[in-house]
Amino acid sequence: RMRSPRPPIPEHRRLVLVFGDRLTLSALAIAEPIQPSLVGAATTEDEGVDLVLRAQPDLLICSSDLETGYGPVLLKCVKTELPTCQLLIVLERETKALVREALDAFADGVIFKSSLGTGRGDLIGALHTLADGGVYYPAEIRRLAAAAPQPDLPPLVEELTQRELDVAAAVARGLKNNAIADLLGISLETVKTHVGNAMDKLGARDRTQMAVTALLYGLIDPLEP
């Protein structure tokens, strides 16, 4: 049976691009899933901050390398100034350190530049998952995050239960509550309870922080599909 095509990215989204590579920036700006929602583009960290504050987007897509400045620093600034804006970062280098920096900035989605235009669908998958309110960390991102050294993490005040770990892992894979309930065979209310408990124990303010913190503590299997 053929899969039904994914619906287009909701066009009411206001999207900003900040890329140091002008060729990539130009290509993304005219790409079908992005162009209808694009409200501005920039190439530097300072320009990106100014543009976000002016345009008030609900999604920022940036690269790790910028003409001046640095993508993860831009994400941290935007997260502080406009916490409602979702953050998707495209990493030029596939290293544990860079993945850790992206997650430390609480990016809602992290993909590698090498995946753009390869047919793997990471960009489209990320756009759809973020539009649905999920987080997007492909398996290779989760693997590198779990492998990164974590010397500065304080000990957890309280251990997560197995069900809370299961739910946190599902959130890190981009699943919403309904899908998690179906996957684990539990009620929607039970999922919400586990999410709330896991957030409390991990000191997370939202689902993105919960997923990131669980990954960085090595609490979930990064190789789960």
Cite the ranges covered by each PLM segment:
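Conserved phosphotransfer cores of two-component systems
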Residues: 53-55, 78-84, 105, 217
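Recognition helix of helix-turn-helix DNA-binding domains
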Residues: 174-209, 224
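Short, flexible helix-to-coil linker/hinge segments that flank and couple to helix-turn-helix
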Residues: 100-109, 115-157, 162
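Conserved acidic segment of CheY-like receiver
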Residues: 10-24, 28-32, 41, 60, ...
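Helix-turn-helix DNA-binding segment
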Residues: 150-190
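Short hydrophobic/Thr-rich beta-strand motif most characteristic of the beta2 strand and flanking loop
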Residues: 36-44, 51, 204
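A short, hydrophobic beta-strand element within the central beta-sheet of small alpha/beta folds
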Residues: 84-96, 110
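Conserved phosphotransfer microenvironments
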Residues: 45-48, 58-78, 91-98
